[in-house]
A protein has these predicted regions:
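P-loop NTPase catalytic core
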Residues: 1-184
């Protein structure tokens, strides 16, 4: 008759096949393959079994949000819902620190957003919320890009640093390749 359904109607073999399918991309003795996969989740539920399984396998994921798109913010990337497990290997320390600070500011703002919008937040109550309020417009401007806008990596990094109130300082990569292997 076949396999019995397990998680939300998906059979166990689906979850067994995902790593084999997704890990075909990668490095081998013959070269490397980069894969960009698209996963449409049921009802925008990021904890849906397939989405959850795929996120656990991949080195990172970019979450697109209908809510952000409805605000005419493009690309409609949910930064707080997106993750890169290799970022520390490919950016320098100042870039990594700025990206982490931006995520923290966005998270603080998201936590307090309802209070801010209804006027219940009193300025000075929390230095973290005050900093997030001060920088959120610059962060959102940094995260918006016109469909025809082309920005170099260097310009993007400069704008990221400016969005969180930092200046560029040349530094070493956040992690040396040997450090990255030891960390995994």
């Amino acid at each position: 008759i076949g396999e019995p359904p397990a998680t939300r109607g998906y059979t166990p073999s689906v979850f067994a096949m995902l790593p084999r399918l997704l890990e075909r991309a990668g490095t081998s003795e013959k070269g490397s393959i980069t894969g960009i996969y698209t996963v449409l989740v049921d009802g925008d539920d990021m904890n849906e079994p397939i989405a959850d399984a795929v996120r656990s396998i991949l080195d990172g994921h970019i979450v697109l949000s209908r809510r952000i798109a409805a605000q005419n913010h493009f690309p409609a990337i949910d930064v707080l819902g997106s993750v890169s497990r290799v970022m520390y290997e490919v950016v320098d320390k100042s870039h990594l620190a700025a990206a982490q600070e931006m995520r923290q500011l966005m998270a603080v703002y998201a936590e307090a957003e309802d209070l801010i919008h209804i006027g219940a937040y009193v300025k000075g109550s929390s230095p973290k919320i005050d900093a997030a309020i001060q920088k959120i417009d610059g962060i959102n401007a940094f995260l918006c890009q016109d469909i025809y806008e082309v920005t170099s990596y260097e310009e993007t990094e400069k704008r990221l640093l400016a969005a969180v109130g930092k200046t560029a300082e040349p530094t070493a990569p956040a992690a040396e390749p040997a450090d990255a292997e030891a960390a995994s």
